[in-house]
Amino acid sequence: MRGLSRRVQAMKPSATVAVNAKALELRRQGVDLVALTAGEPDFDTPEHVKEAARRALAQGKTKYAPPAGIPELREALAEKFRRENGLSVTPEETIVTVGGKQALFNLFQAILDPGDEVIVLSPYWVSYPEMVRFAGGVVVEVETLPEEGFVPDPERVRRAITPRTKALVVNSPNNPTGAVYPKEVLEALARLAVEHDFYLVSDEIYEHLLYEGEHFSPGRVAPEHTLTVNGAAKAFAMTGWRIGYACGPKEVIKAMASVSSQSTTSPDTIAQWATLEALTNQEASRAFVEMAREAYRRRRDLLLEGLTALGLKAVRPSGAFYVLMDTSPIAPDEVRAAERLLEAGVAVVPGTDFAAFGHVRLSYATSEENLRKALERFARVLGRA
């Protein structure tokens, strides 16, 4: 009998991907549109990384790779996690995946049985709940509040823990809020994972895009309970190369590799050699990251100053490249607000699928000129131009 599975029918397409695709299509049709939708850097991949890919091609490094990644990259990852995150891991405790998204997908497939609960802090990246449900898990939302800077309250998290809790997902710096969780908060959450014996899934994909404070990896507190997920996409402007990576307990990493072996086989071999260059040519990569970070900082400040001048509220982000903007001055809800802004020539992502109701997400991974245009169009929507 033909038909789609119930689990696929229950899965929602990614809202952020859909909105960005719509914005790109409108642009292709000639619509004058400022898109503040992209969850990716607007910079090109650094030249030293592209050159490494060309070398790999010239050297014929085009065959299958092992499911967990080429050994050279796993060794570099173990060193990266030690050097930058303070995590004592071996190459066997690392894995390379087809983007950070696959690392998370494989992880939930590896650890969840039907009915297992996963605590997800809201607002959240749109894919966390869908991945959990697809693996048979149950999503338990714990709210973070704008008046608290969208930083989680460990006691609120504690109250959500049950005997069925299998994991807690944390994402700092955060998408969509830009919040950076203080060290003491992450330490408290890590201690909860140890106390109640569940996994702490730490998504650190934006670790290098930090404007205030310091990045802290909770795996330093609870190494046997923590899976640290990261990737090349955001730091090195490599979104299309599709290289993610993770580290954690060896038995979980091995299970994640088994999922890869029966699905994608392995990440792109050439992209792995390029990522190896990004991780090991530290001087060139550091210069690129610092350049990008300072550009994002300027853009963030420009956008926040403009929103404030228009009377629009947003919690100041300390990391990533997103702002959650309160939509109450524009429309009764975030969906209608996004529609009004689109009519004015600005594409944004409604907060609905982030569980950020009454807000839209603005990405400042675009030029300062585009941000100024967007602010001018916001002013027209508000009747102030």
From Swiss-Prot:
Gene3D superfamilies: Aspartate Aminotransferase, domain 1, Type I PLP-dependent aspartate aminotransferase-like (Major domain). It comes from Thermus thermophilus (strain ATCC 27634 / DSM 579 / HB8). It catalyses: L-aspartate + 2-oxoglutarate = oxaloacetate + L-glutamate; L-arogenate + oxaloacetate = prephenate + L-aspartate. One of its GO terms (biological process) is amino acid metabolic process. This is Aspartate/prephenate aminotransferase. The keyword Transferase applies. It is an enzyme of class 2 (transferase). InterPro entries: Aminotransferase_I/II_large, AspAT/PAT-like, NHTrfase_class1_PyrdxlP-BS, PyrdxlP-dep_Trfase, PyrdxlP-dep_Trfase_major, PyrdxlP-dep_Trfase_small.
